[in-house]
């Protein structure tokens, strides 16, 4: 992950502990198979699952996030005009941005917000690429959900950058991806 909040650094420095618990055989077999497929140990996979629960699933549920089929979201958003999509992004940011930041990370900073976005992207299984070149951070997110979703997310991120008073940033889009470029001074 490219950006880390203060809480992430604190958690990392706290060390580890051992714990023993029982897992049903069929579940453990699935975990072993998935770990083998990902070329990881079962321990690493279980730690990633627990971390994902603590850093995303648990706080996201409290913040009002749910799971939706990407195809369904694409169908719905493709019914809207560009103006309606922009209006939805504006209303959503205006009504939910601050609440979401506090519910997910108990702080309302740009770094904590971006940490949340990255956690959501990873948890949702979207492909992304991060570069840090010449004092600029670039995040490319491949949604594969069509032009209208790209327009929504690009607009959403522009509004987020405005909200956090991030200057020298740029959001671009293609039919299936959103590109966010931010100068290093803000990260």
Regions found by a protein language model. Name each.
Residues 47, 114-118, 154-158, 162:
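Generic solvent-exposed, charged/amphipathic alpha-helical segments
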Residues 1-24, 35:
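Short Lys/Arg-rich basic patches
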Residues 30, 40-63:
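Short, basic amphipathic alpha-helical segments that act as recognition/interaction helices
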Residues 70-139:
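An N-terminal amphipathic alpha-helical segment
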Residues 172-187:
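C-terminal edge-of-domain segments
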Residues 123-174:
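Short, hydrophobic/π-rich interface segment
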